[in-house]
Amino acid sequence: MPIHRIGLIGDFDPEVVAHRAIPLAVELAASDCAFSISADWMPTEYLRTASEKVLQGFAGFWCVPGGPYRDMDGALRTIRFAREKRCPFLGTCGGFQHAAIE
């Protein structure tokens, strides 16, 4: 079974409850749907300069809660990539706000 990679756009902070819960939620959803999913944190500073080839390796993106992001442009760049490539995208809380800005 292929592994579907989901990029978690945001700056992981163990103090943010949602950041600790999101990987568990993805894991539970994957097991319910009989998929193999890898949820990979993508720090916004990294996303500012990440190659398009790196971004193409993901089946979808989740712009996660928790902000402000360290690099707003990195988050917006990745949201734009998802929109332009018609890649599945979810923005929650601050992630939704960034999607609206983009």
PLM regions with names:
Residues 1-102:
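N-terminal beta1-alpha1 cap of cysteine-dependent amidohydrolase-like domains
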